[in-house]
Amino acid sequence: MSIAVQTRTAVEIHNAVKAYGDKPVLRGIDLEVAPGTVTVIIGPSGSGKSTLLRAINHLEKLDEGFVVVGGELIGVRAHRGRIRELKEKDILRQRSRIGFVFQNFNLFPHLTILENITEAPISLGTAPAAAKELARSLLASVGLDDKEHAYPRQLSGGQQQRVAIARALAFDPEVILFDEPTSALDPELVGEVLAVIRSLTGTGRTLIVVTHEIGFAREVGDHVIFIDDGVIVEQGTPDAVLDHPHHPRTQNFLSKVL
């Protein structure tokens, strides 16, 4: 197999195919994401959005195709024309360059907020004192510097998601993936999380956000992608996709959510 890597891109997805049993989820998706941009992925539930996002940092293993981040194959290596799985330690190293913010926070309930942020860096060799200093700085950046000794159960959903974002920033990742970061929140808490994500735009990081927040997509997105039934139906600028969609499937979806 010949693999061509584009150094000008932050993320490349080539012919991504994934099925669960006999149900196709991704049907040969190709995508290139420019460095420092915000790409927003929208689409109906079950369309493959989250699966595609999870494939970028190899939380989902593709049946066919491959992913490249920063010029490096993710989760696999090319060997004598074949794709082979990397060792777990090498996959974990790669994931440290790719932040991931989950829909349901995924904080450790038995650890304090500070420990939730320091746990991974310390396990990968960062000195505890340095990890704590960084964690405190990150908590301050998301407005939670007074919560370092609290436990997740003592925080609101919005606060927990802000901690999750701080944790994703702990390795200073090149790319940050957000999997519907506001969908588990009460409506009044959505704004505080979107404000933190908004603050990350223009920092040089590449953000890829799966969301149902169409207004947010219009405001911060450089590129909007509409996915349905495992394929990219339409993509372009927010104005093109959200305000002047060409494909009937895009038009139908937006008519139901706007």
Model-derived features: positions:
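Short coil-to-helix segment of the ABC ATPase nucleotide-binding domain corresponding to the Q-loop/switch region
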Residues: L111-E119
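Conserved signature/switch motifs of ABC ATPase nucleotide-binding domains
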Residues: A150-R153, F171, T203
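Catalytic Walker B motif of ABC-type/P-loop ATPase nucleotide-binding domains
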Residues: I176-D179
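Helix N-cap at the start of a conserved alpha-helix in ABC-type nucleotide-binding domains
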Residues: P187-L189
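H-loop/switch region of ABC-family ATPase nucleotide-binding domains
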Residues: T211-H212
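ABC ATPase "signature
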Residues: Q235-G236
